[in-house]
């Protein structure tokens, strides 16, 4: 599928002002090459913005990662590729699900990585882990990268609480 969508990017709060943003026209698509292989893409063109007064300069000695948002917003205001991610999905064992992905994973980083999810059938919980090798994208959000790269990962626990209520007004529980 593909679709054309309106898009609003924003930076809310800060010393430069309360709201900075841009209105964009975006193209989103998903190509399904096989039952378990997809390519997600998202690109957009800027229509109007108010980024001229946005500064938010950081003087931190730590690597500037998310604090570089101003550069990403300003240098990608005409055209940007937000995402272009090739993913493969697997079910290697019962109750075990996996995904591997590579590409431009989000507006600031691209890379390669994977996720595993253990979700027992008829249970309301799951346990997952993911690891990614990522590199910081160029500020214009096109095809280039900067020098900064790192490995990141997460462990996730999910619990779906289905509320049960009885006739007693104060009897509400998770089941």
Predicted regions and their residues:
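Disulfide-stabilized cysteine-rich extracellular repeat microdomains
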Residues: 46, 170-171
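Outer-membrane pore/translocation modules
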Residues: 1-20, 30-155, 159
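Predominantly the C-terminal beta-signal and adjacent terminal strand-loop region
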Residues: 173-175
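Conserved small/polar residues in nucleotide/adenosyl-binding loops
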Residues: 164-169
């Amino acid at each position: 599928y593909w679709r054309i969508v309106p898009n609003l990017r924003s930076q809310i709060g800060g010393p430069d002002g309360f709201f900075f943003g841009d209105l964009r026209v975006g193209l989103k698509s998903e190509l399904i090459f096989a039952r378990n292989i997809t390519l997600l893409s998202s690109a957009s063109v800027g229509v109007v913005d108010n980024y001229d007064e946005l500064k938010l300069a950081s003087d931190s000695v730590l690597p500037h990662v998310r604090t570089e948002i101003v550069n990403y917003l300003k240098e990608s205001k005409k055209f940007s590729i937000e995402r272009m991610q090739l993913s493969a999905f697997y079910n290697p064992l019962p109750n075990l699900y996996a995904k591997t992905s590579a590409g431009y994973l989000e507006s600031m980083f691209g890379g390669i990585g994977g996720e595993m999810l253990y979700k027992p059938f008829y249970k309301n919980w799951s346990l997952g882990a993911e690891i990614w090798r990522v590199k910081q994208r160029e500020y214009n959000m096109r095809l280039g990268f900067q020098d900064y790269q790192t490995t990141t990962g997460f462990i996730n626990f999910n619990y779906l609480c289905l509320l049960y209520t009885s006739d007693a007004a104060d009897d509400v529980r998770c089941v």
